[in-house]
C-alpha cells in the first residue's frame, strides 16, 4: 500500500471502481422464490417478487454504505481487506495523518509492488473532490458515482438483498456473499453464454434480433462480434463509404460454447488474454490544462468549399428561407452499397460512444445526467446574467465527467473521444435550447439597438459600395456572392458552434480565393476585412450578429486558438464596423485598428490564460525493464531540477531515485542537468529525459559543474553545452506550452509539441 502521505495516480488513469453492481436493470417478474439475501451465484430466491423498479447506482451506494464506508479502519485494515479482492474494489477510510477521508482502490497485480492506491478526499464549501482534481461533487456518494465503472460483481437487484448486505457491515468482506471465482483472472469478465432458441421462436419473432450487436459495456467481445458480422456478409465496401473499423490484432475466437458442446470444441477457445484491451498508459495531469484537448478545426487551406459537410445534418427546423442551391445534384449510390455502409456505421465506435453518452445524459440518476437535466431546466426557466458563459462551463464539466466514465473503455483515442463527446453534448443540450437562446439574444440585441444599427449599416454599405470602407475591392460576379450567402445560411441553421465555425471557414475561403485574384498573394487583414464587410452587407443577414455572440461564448476555448477563432473574430470586427457606419463619426476606425480592438477584448474574456499552460513539462522516462514512456508533469514556476527529479521519482514509481537523474537529450548525447538549475529556464533545443545514471564519468562531470554554479567562468561553458537561454530568459525546451501568438491565429499548437516529444522517445 502506498505511503499515506503520498497520493497515487488519478483513479481514472488506473483502475476504475467496480464494487457497485452492473448496469441498472429492471427487475423482471418471476415465479422464483425470493429470499432476503442472494445466494452465492447471484440468483434470487424467495417468495413472489415486488413490482418492477430500477435500483439506481446512487441507491446501491447509499444502501451499502456500511460496507464500503469504514471510517474506523486504518491503512492496515484496508490493506488486509483489499488484498484478496479483484482490481477496482474500493474502501473509504479516514486518514489519521491528514485528518481527512481517503479512497483506497485495489490495483492490478502488474501495477507494481503497491497493489492498493490511496486518494485523499478534500471537502470544501462547494462540495467534495479528490486531491489534485478539479471535478467537484455534491457529496461523497456523488463522487463515487462519478468514478464508478459498472461491473456485475454481485447481482443484487432488490432493496432487500442490498439491505441484507448492508447489515453485515465490515463482516461482508469475509462472508459467503462476497464470492470470488479463483479459477480465472479477476480483471477478466466472464464470457456470456448464448441462449439457443427453437425455430418456432425464430419464426414467431418473439425473441431478440437475429443479428447480435455487442453493446458498449463491458465491450471485451466487441471487435470479435464486429469482425464476425463483417465476414458474414459477402459485401465489398469501398474505402470511401466504410467506417474506420480495424480488425482485431489476433484471429477472432469462435462462438462461446453452448451447453452440451463437446470438449474438443472447448479446447479450441483461445486464452482470455487475447480478448483483453490494452491497458491505458500515460499520466493525466489534474486540471483543465491536462485534459485531452479537442482536435483543432481544419485550416483555411484544408476546408473544401464545394464538398458537403457533416454539419449539414445539424440543421434546425426553424431555419430561414434559402435560395436555390448552386451545387450540382448528387449521384445516387447503389442500394447495396448504401445498405452495407449503413450496417457498418451502426458498428462504428463513434456511434457506440455517442449512444452511451446520450443514455448517461438522459438518466437523471447518474451524476452527468443530473447535471445536464438541471441545466436544461434552469435555462428553460428564465434568462440569467452571463447565461451563455454558464452553459459553456457546464458543458466542459459534463464532458470531463463523460470522459471519465467512457474513457477506460479504450474504444477511441483521447482526442477523438473528446470530439465525439462534445458533439453529443451539443446534440443533447444545445439543440433543444437553440430556439430559446436565439430568441433571447435577438430580444436583447433588439432592445439595445444593436440589430437596428447593423441593419442601417447594411443599407449604407450597399449604397456607398466599397468606398464606405476605403477600399475598391469587391466580388466580380453575383454568383460568388450567392455562394458565400449559402454558406452563411447554413451557419444560421446549425445549432453546434463548432459546425458553425466550419461553415464560416468555408465562406472565408471563398472570399480569400476572390481576394487573391484581385489583390495578389500578399493580401492581408487590411484587404480582407473591407471585402468581408461589403459581402455581409450584400447578403443582408442581421442574425449573424447574434450568431457571432453565440459562437464566441459557446465554442470550446481550445478551438479559439486557431484559424477558426481568428476568422470568428474577423466576423465580429466586421459586424462592429458595419454597425459603426450608422453613427455620426467623422473618421471611423481603420479596419486593422477595429480588428485589433475586438481581438483584445475577446482575448481577455474568452481565451484561456497562458499562465495555466506554462507550468507543464513533458518528461520521458527510460525504464530498463519496460522501455520508454512519457508524462506531462505540473511543475510550479521557480522549481529546480532537484524538485523536478523528486516529482519524476514519485510519478514514475522509481524505487532508487538516487540512481536516476534528469538529462537533456541534445546533439545525439545526454547532458545531465545540475540540481540547482531552474526547470523553466532550460533551453528549447533538447528533450528532458529521466533515466538511470549508468556512467560514473557523466556524474563526475556534472558534479564538478554543479560545484562551480553560475558565478564562475564555467557557467558559460554549461550554457554553451546545453544551448543557452534566449535573451528574454524564457524556456525554449519542447514542453506543452501555449502563448498569445497562437491565440491570434498561430499554427503551432500543443499537439505538435507533443509529437516532437514522441520523436525524442523514438530516437
Swiss-Prot record:
Phosphorylated on tyrosine residues by ABL1 and ABL2. Phosphorylation at Ser-340 by PRKD1 induces interaction with 14-3-3 proteins. Residues 727-755 have a biased composition (Basic and acidic residues). Residues 316-326 have a biased composition (Low complexity). Ras effector protein, which may serve as an inhibitory modulator of neuronal plasticity in aversive memory formation. Can affect Ras signaling at different levels. First, by competing with RAF1 protein for binding to activated Ras. Second, by enhancing signaling from ABL1 and ABL2, which regulate cytoskeletal remodeling. Third, by activating RAB5A, possibly by functioning as a guanine nucleotide exchange factor (GEF) for RAB5A, by exchanging bound GDP for free GTP, and facilitating Ras-activated receptor endocytosis. One of its GO terms (molecular function) is GTPase activator activity. SUPFAM superfamilies: SH2 domain, VPS9 domain. The modification N-acetylmethionine is found at residue 1. Highly expressed in brain. Weakly or no expressed in other tissues, except in testis, where it is expressed at intermediate level. In brain, it is mainly expressed in postnatal forebrain neurons in which it is localized in dendrites and colocalizes with Ras. This is Ras and Rab interactor 1. The modification Phosphotyrosine is found at residue 35. Residues 1-52, 177-200, 238-273, 301-331, 698-763 are annotated as: Disordered. One of its GO terms (cellular component) is dendrite. Residues 68-151 form the SH2 domain. The gene is Rin1. Residues 445-587 form the VPS9 domain. Gene3D superfamilies: SH2 domain (3.30.505.10), VPS9 domain (1.20.1050.80). It is found in: Cytoplasm; Membrane; Cytoplasm, Cytoskeleton. Interacts with the GTP-bound form of Ras proteins (NRAS, HRAS and KRAS). This interaction prevents the association between RAF1 and Ras. Interacts with 14-3-3 proteins YWHAB, YWHAE and YWHAZ when phosphorylated on Ser-340. Interacts with the SH3 domain of ABL1 and ABL2. Interacts with RAB5A. The interaction with Ras is probably regulated and antagonized by the interaction with 14-3-3 proteins. The interaction with 14-3-3 proteins is regulated by phosphorylation on Ser-340. Residues 613-695 form the Ras-associating domain. InterPro entries: RA_dom, RIN1_SH2, SH2, SH2_dom_sf, VPS9, Vps9-like, VPS9_dom_sf. It comes from the Eukaryota. Its main location: cytoplasm. The modification Omega-N-methylarginine is found at residue 681. The modification Phosphoserine is found at residues 198, 246, 319, 323, 340, 598. Residues 245-257 have a biased composition (Pro residues).
